[in-house]
Amino acid sequence: MNSGVLLSESETDTSETSERQSGLLSAQGSIKGKLEEFSAKLDRLRLDDENSEEEHALKSQSVSVNSEGNISRSASASASASASASAKLRNSQSPVQEYTSDTNPETDASFRVKIRLRPIGSIPQIQPRVCQISSHQNFSALVKFLCKRLKRNHVHCYINNAFAPSLNQTIGDLWSQFKTNDELIVSYCETVAFG
């Protein structure tokens, strides 16, 4: 009777051992699958070839799963892999950080745009020829300024002698699209100059 109990305990021990081994095998398969998936993701994320030595070290290192289900890597290989991953992360983030940290004068509310005023025809020249206006103001503010300065009821204005912008368009948008030597060239006249 005693041997029967011992036999059943040994049977449970072997069944537990076989369950552990099958669990380890499935864990090894899932770990191996995860490692392959991670490797494929890293291959897709390769952004530049500057770190080719680090990438070569990452490819040449061997990752093994031992019988206990633990992942073993040499310490230097894991350090080089983490250094490579952090370098890639820094390289991929740096253009975004530089772009967002740069101040864009066109979006700055206090940015002032230089405007060069050129007369067309017999209309008098305004002195000084270059003035500054806030970039968030509409083009109508410039037209009103010219009307007051020239003492006229109406003035026709053109950008780069090419087109008449709408009065509600912002000066900053016009400057960013049509600037010449960081100045917006505005031609003005009494009558319609360009049909």
From Swiss-Prot:
CDD domains on file: Ubl_ATG12
An MF annotation (GO) of this entry: Atg8-family ligase activity
SUPFAM superfamilies: Ubiquitin-like (SSF54236)
Protein keywords: Autophagy, Isopeptide bond, Membrane, Protein transport, Transport, Ubl conjugation pathway
GO biological process, one term: autophagy of mitochondrion
Glycyl lysine isopeptide (Gly-Lys) (interchain with K-145 in ATG5) cross-link site: G195
Superkingdom of origin organism: Eukaryota
Basic and acidic residues: compositionally biased ranges: 46-58
Location of the region described as Disordered in the Swiss-Prot/TrEMBL record: 1-29, 46-71, 86-105
GO cellular component, as recorded: Atg12-Atg5-Atg16 complex; autophagosome membrane; phagophore assembly site membrane
Compartments it resides in: Preautophagosomal structure membrane
Keyword Zinc among record annotations: no
Null allele phenotype: Impairs the formation of preautophagosomal structures.
InterPro entries: Atg12, Ubiquitin-like_domsf
UniProt keyword Signal, yes or no: no
Biased composition (Polar residues): 20-29, 59-71, 89-105
PANTHER family reported in the protein's UniProt record: AUTOPHAGY PROTEIN 12, UBIQUITIN-LIKE PROTEIN ATG12
Quaternary data: Forms a conjugate with ATG5. Forms a thioester bond with the 'Cys-116' of ATG10. Interacts with the ATG7 C-terminal 40 amino acids domain. The ATG12-ATG5 conjugate forms a complex with several units of ATG16. The ATG12-ATG5 conjugate also associates with ATG3.
Job description of the protein: Ubiquitin-like protein involved in cytoplasm to vacuole transport (Cvt), autophagy vesicles formation, mitophagy, and nucleophagy. Conjugation with ATG5 through a ubiquitin-like conjugating system involving also ATG7 as an E1-like activating enzyme and ATG10 as an E2-like conjugating enzyme, is essential for its function. The ATG12-ATG5 conjugate acts as an E3-like enzyme which is required for lipidation of ATG8 and ATG8 association to the vesicle membranes. ATG12-ATG5 rearranges the ATG3 catalytic center and enhances its E2 activity.
Family: Belongs to the ATG12 family.
Further comment found in the protein's record: Kluyveromyces marxianus proteins are shorter in length and have a more ordered secondary structure than their S.cerevisiae counterparts, which might contribute to the superior thermotolerance and solubility. K.marxianus could be therefore useful as a new model organism for further elucidation of the molecular details of autophagy.
Name of the molecule in the record: Ubiquitin-like protein ATG12
Organism: Kluyveromyces marxianus (strain DMKU3-1042 / BCC 29191 / NBRC 104275) (Yeast)
